[in-house]
Amino acid sequence: MEGRKVAFAAAALAGIAAAYGFRRWHPSRIEVEGSSMRPTLEPGDWAIAFRARRLHRGDVVVVEHPDRVGFELVKRVTHLPGDVAPDGLGLADRVWVEGDDPEGSSDSRSFGPLPMGLVRGRVWFVWWPPGRIRALGPR
């Protein structure tokens, strides 16, 4: 009987910890559709992104397109708040994002810097297809 109580308590604590983690880091599943992040991400890759409290130059992030509500893009952070963007303007609470393959990439070069509020999360790892499973870090 005592062993059951311990097992139940452990399971309850694990459930609470998992719920807290999901709520705090808000994981989301991402399917890569375009080729703008080649060779880092290929069309058909599936990845997991978590809400990011702090960004670093080189992070791969999910952002909402500034002109298309609800349309998300996967890009790389090249300039952070406090930097001077390639267009010569200072970035206060904004980031500059670009695709790894500039050909055909819809990114800050076309729509400018993004408010931090449009950054949805940081891509942590690719989980599909099996031959491409790996963690992603800043480049």
Question: What are the functions of these language-model segments?
Answer:
Residues 1-139:
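Extended hydrophobic leader/signal-anchor segments used for secretion and membrane insertion
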